[in-house]
Amino acid sequence: MHLLVDFGKIKKLIAELINASKAIKIDKEYLRRLDSSFESSYQYLFHAGFRSLRLYRISHAFYVSDFKFLAYLIYHINRILYTVDIHPAAVLEPGVVIDHGTGLVIGSTAVVGSGTVLYHGVTLGAKYITKGKRHPTVGRNVIVGAGAKVLGPVYIGDNAKIGANSVVISDVPKGATAVGIPARIVFKNSTESPKPHLFHSTIDKNDAGDELCHKKENNLKKVLM
């Protein structure tokens, strides 16, 4: 009797779900530190941005483990419940903060670094329909304001800020502020150091983020090949 069970895939799924659980713990730590309205641990139960991020992490675990149907099912549930559209193939480092979440769109080849805050209505999308890398790479400790659109395979440097409703179609340097349509650099400070409160914790978040994100990127490359 032939058993249609791929134990290798199941083993990989278990490992990815464990990674997702670790990432969610780091997400909680960042949310507590970065959301000024956060008052008590019970808010995790009602914070739509955090809950949608948690669903993304689960869908991503299924996606990179080649359980595509279940990955897209969870992705669709996320869209219905929270109006958040994060493709399960996207790579979000542990420690991303989604504030409100409503209308957020993140494409399949996008990468987002830890400490980054994404407000409602943000789009990390493509400029053209093409194969390969076509969505933004957002560094660490970036703020992307409400309604901002970052389009194409552009790079947003660490500690950068994108103004609300801006449309970014070119790279933004580290520490810079970009506003407008199309976005222009209005402030540039490449020597700006990371915000210290993001890194002083009992959890070594960036090391954990590096390890998990490298694994996810390697898995994603295999899936997209």
What are these regions (language model features)?
Residues M1-Y82, S193-M225:
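Terminal amphipathic alpha-helical/low-complexity segments used for targeting or macromolecular assembly
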Residues Y82, H87-P88, E93-P94, D99-S108, ...:
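Left-handed beta-helix
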